[in-house]
Design a protein with these regions (language model features):
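Structural beta-alpha unit
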Residues: 1, 76-111
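Intrinsically disordered or low-complexity boundary/linker segments at protein termini
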Residues: 1-18, 81-85, 89, 135-145
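Small/aliphatic-rich secondary-structure junction motif
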Residues: 2-54, 104
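Active-site phosphate/pyrophosphate- and oxyanion-stabilizing loops and adjacent acidic/basic residues
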Residues: 24, 76, 131
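Conserved beta-strand termini and adjacent loop/short-helix elements that scaffold enzyme active sites
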Residues: 37-39, 91-95, 144
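A short acidic, glycine-rich active-site loop
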Residues: 54-70
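Gly/Ser-rich helix-loop-strand patches that form or flank binding pockets
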Residues: 104-145
Length: 145
């Protein structure tokens, strides 16, 4: 692998969580760290994240808190399966999921992602994030069903 990391994008869906197990296996096999990525899409509503708010500022704060808690939980769960000395770096980006994943994938050795994620408006607008990543990434991509 080109660098010391496996990129694992997540949208917190069951399929994405299943893909995390494969990312841990790859990291252990190649003795590399994991970069866990979540992209907050502008097309996703507070309802998708299960957050009720009164103002845009409150929405931003609640979403950030929700995403941070989910990422920390996934990081702790994944760390249990990693060999000693390997680490997980959590990254949250804002924007189009395909674009942000591809930007993050520019300097990793491999991407491990789910074949499909959560359903909602974002998927209706751009349903094939995994296809975009497979087609455009410069590194190997493992797509997990």
């Amino acid at each position: 692998m080109r660098t010391q990391e496996v990129l694992c994008p997540t949208d917190f869906s069951a399929t994405a969580t299943h893909a995390l197990k494969y990312a841990v296996e790859m990291a252990n096999l190649y003795q590399v760290d994991i970069r866990l990525l979540h992209v907050v899409s502008p097309a996703r509503s507070a309802h998708f994240y299960g957050v009720a708010v009164e103002t845009p500022a409150a929405l931003e704060q609640k979403l950030a808190q929700f995403v941070d808690e989910k990422m920390q939980s996934l990081q702790q769960e994944m760390q249990l399966g990693l060999k000693p000395g390997l680490n997980i770096k959590c990254i949250v980006r804002h924007g189009d999921a395909s674009e942000e994943i591809l930007a993050e994938a520019a300097d990793v050795g491999m991407v491990v992602l789910a074949s499909h994620g959560s359903s909602g408006l974002a998927d209706f607008l751009k349903p094939h994030v995994s296809q975009d990543v497979v087609r455009l990434a410069k590194c190997p991509v493992l797509v997990v069903k």
